[in-house]
């Protein structure tokens, strides 16, 4: 008898359960084969970002199987076998590891096959209400559905989700199939034909669970032919109280995402460019916050320049400090000064035993020979205290000259500011007379000092800006106003945004009276893509799917290539191509659309003019082709 450990443990059963990744893979293959390859005019959104379409699945083969096996014979099991016998589907089925996963895939594929049965009350279509330029899948009713009736074949498969999977789907913006179970209080992911049902604040259907992994849509009110089947995603799914909802109910009520955005005067003033007034804006406001703080904390009366200057980089110039210290070490006691200097400018001079007279312009000892250094500084007069402390520390280790007697050195170091605005000049004159009092260094130190001063004159370096004193720019309002995407009810129909080519135009469908964009409309199509696809698959005009009783003598068209899909020349001549069907101003919604202009009595007085125009266009097209 096998032990309990040898039996199937819950971990093994959990490992074999249906997961989100497996179900997403099944759904991508099923929608690619049975929706996108069934004469569909666009591609549905896939769950995997890098999905590659299955090779070996051809559109004509899929349509033939659906027509003969599903629509006419009503044998979905035989259609399933023929579909799985195709080379692309056979390869995918062979890659599945075990029989259990193969059964899961067949079960999920069967849901998409059954929605093509003639008794199915819905079909997949598209809408551009939400994004204007891109068509999203939707569910449209082609039969009348009573209130409380379970919508046949509009079902899906549920699979529980983990927190990591939910966050990943949120980042990929593929979270439109997440539902919250009211019984389990956990999020689940559902896929299948029901995933194409969009949200509406006044939905005509609701999602109900069937078993542990099934989900069905039940009609909450009567649904008429041509009406979109919708469900409710939640009260706060599109923001708080669905404030960003773009459903049809909100469009008719002009609320939430369709509400007009009225900009206040404050908002418009913030969006506009501020007017710079020299009297209203002080110079301190043009400086960085660190510099402004330094001015407020210091006791000096130094005012910044009247014109704002660009702040250059600050670099440590050790040679300047070394020369200043070496000249100040042998200076005797000097006379007092009437104007005490600011602390920010005298911090570069080390303390001496004597009381030297220090001013903002000159430093004058008592008597003797003079050393004058006149320098026009291009740097800011308010240097950072932390940098000054660093430089003071380095200057304490520098050597002093041994003997300097009756030496007069005059070096003028003028640094021309390369910036757009001139900098204020600060003159520092050092007049030093002293006697040789220390013989610790050789007399060649004078030449070293001169060479260092010449290096300062010849190679002026831009001050290097430290990381701490980085210029922090304030937030400057933009010159252009922010372009808020304001939606207007009906702005997704008869708009010029979808007319990319010269011969693209809006055309009115002769079957369902819905406006659609026809690309390269050299000849006008009679039906919209939905009605034309329905006719190609079922052989009848939309929404008819089968004969309506024994008295119906209309024959099904088994070969769609025998049907003429364009207007006849006499019908083409009555169509107005003015403005390519674009309506300016507020475009009405499809339900409240204006009457068709492509009728027999429209522009009857201009038949001859339209006929000539059509002949001219035809002749020019023939010449270009």
Curated annotation (Swiss-Prot):
Coiled coil, from the record: none
Residue segments, region Disordered: 260-348, 368-405, 432-451, 457-476, 582-625
An annotated GO BP: methylation
Record-level Gene Ontology MF annotations: histone H4K20 trimethyltransferase activity
Keyword Cytoplasm: no
Classification via SUPFAM superfamilies: SET domain
EC id: 2.1.1.372
Keyword S-adenosyl-L-methionine recorded: yes
InterPro entries: Hist-Lys_N-MTase_N, Set9_fungi, SET_dom, SET_dom_sf, Suv4-20/Set9
Biased composition (Basic and acidic residues): 593-610
Superkingdom: Eukaryota
Residue span, SET domain: 120-234
Ranges of Polar residues composition bias in the record: 269-286, 372-386
Keywords carried by this UniProt record: Chromatin regulator, Chromosome, Methyltransferase, Nucleus, S-adenosyl-L-methionine, Transferase
GO cellular component: chromosome; nucleus
Biased composition (Basic residues): 462-473, 611-625
Subcellular compartments: Nucleus; Chromosome
Recorded catalytic activity of this chain's protein: L-lysyl(20)-[histone H4] + 3 S-adenosyl-L-methionine = N(6),N(6),N(6)-trimethyl-L-lysyl(20)-[histone H4] + 3 S-adenosyl-L-homocysteine + 3 H(+)
Function: Histone methyltransferase that trimethylates 'Lys-20' of histone H4 to form H4K20me3.
Family according to the record: Belongs to the class V-like SAM-binding methyltransferase superfamily. Histone-lysine methyltransferase family. Suvar4-20 subfamily.
Name under which the protein is recorded: Histone-lysine N-methyltransferase set9
Originating organism: Aspergillus oryzae (strain ATCC 42149 / RIB 40)
Taxon lineage: Eukaryota, Fungi, Dikarya, Ascomycota, Pezizomycotina
Underlying gene: set9
